[in-house]
């Protein structure tokens, strides 16, 4: 059963176990992801040499498509295959997948190769993977006329994974059930890398929690709560960013002392 205590327990387990999380980052947010993982108690390694991949004692893999090139997509695929061989959870963030036809085709090929355990993305990116939108401008394009709960469920069923869809409304789905989370702050859309940070936190929790649905929900809920508290101590997006990193290290305590706001239901049959 989903409760504040079950989510807080995930974060306590993370800090106790301090798992090594392998992140193949994009060129924009690598430093943010490393610092976020350190803040919550994980141990990040941002290895990009394929010869190392099979040798790393990592317990999860996080892949970011944010700055794709042909060589970089091959690198992501190699990291994914190494994680598959070790039976590790793989979290994929198909950043800006709707921006160009090339990027979308590259993302689809990567998904087919690595078969991610979890996809973390926004609504516009999800629609691109479902072929329900054309080329998008930017990575945070919204589509208000689509129900994110239905989109998340469709995506989860199509690719056989858990989907963490973040934005104005956060939804997590395994294709059968969906959980809508109601935490966060508008300033998250005004700083670079918020979504990428959530992706890395999902990877950290999936490293210590076998229930990947719970790990994804816990990461998104905890990050949203941290953002809410950070906003109380900030004057604007710049100071909010600093305050957010301060709060990441206290997520378990925030959840213990906060009201978890969520809805959970089963998807209707198609």
UniProtKB/Swiss-Prot annotation:
Positions bound to ATP: 120, 166
SUPFAM superfamilies (alphabetical): Ribokinase-like
Keyword ATP-binding (UniProt): yes
Cofactor(s) demanded: Mg(2+)
Membrane-spanning ranges: none
Lineage: superkingdom: Bacteria
GO MF annotation terms: ATP binding; hydroxyethylthiazole kinase activity; magnesium ion binding
Record protein name field: Hydroxyethylthiazole kinase
Organism: Herpetosiphon aurantiacus (strain ATCC 23779 / DSM 785 / 114-95)
Gene transcribed to yield this protein: thiM
């Amino acid at each position: 059963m989903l409760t504040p205590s079950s989510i807080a327990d995930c974060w306590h387990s993370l800090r106790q176990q301090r798992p090594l999380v392998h992140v193949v980052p994009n060129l924009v947010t690598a430093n943010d992801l490393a610092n976020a993982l350190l803040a919550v108690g994980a141990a990040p390694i941002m290895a990009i040499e394929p010869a190392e991949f099979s040798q790393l004692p990592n317990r999860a893999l996080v892949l970011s498509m944010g700055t794709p090139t042909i060589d970089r997509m091959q690198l992501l695929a190699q990291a994914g295959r190494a994680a598959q061989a070790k039976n590790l959870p793989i979290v994929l963030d198909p950043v800006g997948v709707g921006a160009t036809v090339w990027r979308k085709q590259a993302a689809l090929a990567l998904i087919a190769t690595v078969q991610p355990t979890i996809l973390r993305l926004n609504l516009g990116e999800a629609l691109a993977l479902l072929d329900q939108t054309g080329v998008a401008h930017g990575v945070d394009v919204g589509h208000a006329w689509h129900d994110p709960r239905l989109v998340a469920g469709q995506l989860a069923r199509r690719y056989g994974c858990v989907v963490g869809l973040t934005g104005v409304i956060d939804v997590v789905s395994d294709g059968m059930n969906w959980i809508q989370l109601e935490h966060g702050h508008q300033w998250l859309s005004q700083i670079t890398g918020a979504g990428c940070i959530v992706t890395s936190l999902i990877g950290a929790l999936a490293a210590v929690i076998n229930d990947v649905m719970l790990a994804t929900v816990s990461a998104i809920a905890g990050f949203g709560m941290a953002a809410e508290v950070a906003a109380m101590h900030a004057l604007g997006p710049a100071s909010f960013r600093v305050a957010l990193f301060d709060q990441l290290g206290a997520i378990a305590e925030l959840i213990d002392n906060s009201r978890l706001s969520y809805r959970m239901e089963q998807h209707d049959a198609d």
